[in-house]
Amino acid sequence: MTQANNAVYTDISAAQLVEEAIRRGEGELAANGSLVVRTGHRTGRSPVDRFIVEEPSTKDAIAWGNINRPFPADKFDALWARVEAFNNAQDHFVSHVHVGAAEAYYLPVKMTTATAWQNLFGRCLFIEPEQYNPAGKDEWQVLNVANFECVPERDGTNSDGCVILNFAQKKVLIAGMRYAGEMKKAMFSVQNFLLPERDVLPMHCAANIGEAGDVTLFFGLSGTGKTTLSADESRYLIGDDEHGWGEGVVFNVEGGCYAKCIDLSEKNEPVIWKAIKFGAVLENVVLDEERVPDYADDSLTQNSRAAYPLEHVEKRSEKNLGGEPNAVIFLTCDLTGVLPPVSILNNEQAAYHFLSGYTALVGSTEMGSGGGIKSTFSTCFGAPFFPRPAGVYAELLIKRIKAFGSKVYLVNTGWTGGGYGVGKRFNIPTTRGVIAAIQSGALVDAETEHLDIINLDVPKAVPGVETNLLNPRNTWADKAAYDEAAKGLARQFIENFKKFEVSDAIKAAGPQL
């Protein structure tokens, strides 16, 4: 179909999208068959450019602030019309996809992009249904025009690019953004607002299933190990990043994975390595003369990425869903070396650590954060994506854990034997050993030791993991230095938690001085 001599490519195949992208100079083929693209000066999400339209349905329901910035409805209408007119005057690409794998909870989405590669990215990350919108639900529209430049004075944006969610009109406008992760996270934020209304907990987590049907969830910020640890050759992958937990079901919000590529190796991450082939997209990965990806090269960014459909993963849940979780794991990357490799949490501790979301920003996905590593507290292990007040999500989590009897664990994928620069980071095989012990049920009734100050209970033995690692104090040469570091971390937790209005039982479940 054409509009004023411009071609509109609707629901063309992945192979055709690759062909169009290369023909238009949008990217190049790597030796492994993937399409390699560069995203320009933005190599991560841009939180300061993200807005939600303020209207009656959102006015009192959103936690407005630095993360959820309000945008006027009239300004949105003017900008949408401007971007749409601009895009209609050039070739563009349309695909029809679902967001949400469970029949009851999917959103039908018409995704329009100015570039072929971003459409391919959306096809990797969202769900390509056998039949589009069988239930006849109201359609959402994503309009993603990377070559449109916003003018802040005219458009009301913060810069030349923007991401704006409009719940009343079921529209997502993305303009001036080449980093495709914005598209994925925008639709995640949409579901994160809508699902709690249906008594479903939206989660920034990975999920997989064992041979016996047991489900494990892995919560964590980018770089803490969600994708790596859930990609386990002995288990079936549901998904690596975004899920919903309703009564009787855990379902993927997406149909693909978005894996960090920095220092990717076939030995440590075979599932991800094999998934990067024709049909996948590599963002900001450097190629050598033979077009072989050099995953160790971070000259473009620490946040290099691979997008691939779940079909590229051999062992996966065919329907992108499973039952409720036996094990819920909070992954934290602790820079201080204070937290143990694994702690067993009760319900109050689960609520406390879910709300705290303590971790480190590792090779951050956000622009302007630099390549450094720093500690952070990110509520629900994904504060940038949760529009409602944090308590809404925490209450739903505890409700689900209690109803199903899920066991909850805090797993440190960060430092041991000292803080960052002194100690060393837990290696992936050690953490995999911890995860395997959790999934086998070995820790359900394990004998524990209580750690004062940080107020956590750790198992005295974990099959396959060195016992001397389990109590972090034992791994420090200077025990007094450990105690001081523990007090310092406890102070950070206590200070951060002051903003939450919760029961005394939950407050008492955190670190104590």
Curated annotation (Swiss-Prot):
- Reaction catalysis annotation: oxaloacetate + ATP = phosphoenolpyruvate + ADP + CO2
Q: Which is one Pfam family of this protein? A: PEPCK_ATP
- This enzyme's EC code(s): 4.1.1.49
Its assembly, as annotated, is: Monomer.
The entry's Mn(2+)-binding residues are K185, H204, D241
Q: Where, by residue number, does substrate bind?
A: R45, Y179, K185, R305
The domain of life is: Bacteria
Where in the cell? Cytoplasm
Q: How is the cofactor bound?
A: Binds 1 Mn(2+) ion per subunit.
**Family statement drawn from the similarity comment of this UniProt entry:** Belongs to the phosphoenolpyruvate carboxykinase (ATP) family.
What Gene3D superfamilies has UniProt attached to this entry? 3.90.228.20, Phosphoenolpyruvate Carboxykinase, domain 1 (3.40.449.10), Phosphoenolpyruvate Carboxykinase, domain 2 (2.170.8.10)
- According to UniProt, the name of this protein is Phosphoenolpyruvate carboxykinase (ATP)
Give the residues the record marks as binding ATP.
K185, H204, G220, L221, S222, G223, T224, G225, K226, T227, T228, E269, R305, T431
State the InterPro entries in the record: PEP_carboxykinase_ATP (IPR001272), PEP_carboxykinase_C (IPR013035), PEP_carboxykinase_N (IPR008210), PEPCK_ATP_CS (IPR015994)
Please describe what this protein does.
Involved in the gluconeogenesis. Catalyzes the conversion of oxaloacetate (OAA) to phosphoenolpyruvate (PEP) through direct phosphoryl transfer between the nucleoside triphosphate and OAA.
Q: Which GO terms describe its molecular function?
A: ATP binding; metal ion binding; phosphoenolpyruvate carboxykinase (ATP) activity
User: Which cofactors, by name?
Assistant: Mn(2+)
Annotated pathway: Carbohydrate biosynthesis; gluconeogenesis
The reply on keyword Acetylation is: no
Ordered alphabetically, the record's keywords are: ATP-binding, Cytoplasm, Decarboxylase, Gluconeogenesis, Lyase, Manganese, Metal-binding, Nucleotide-binding
**An example Gene Ontology cellular component term from the record?**
cytosol
- GO biological process, alphabetically ordered: gluconeogenesis
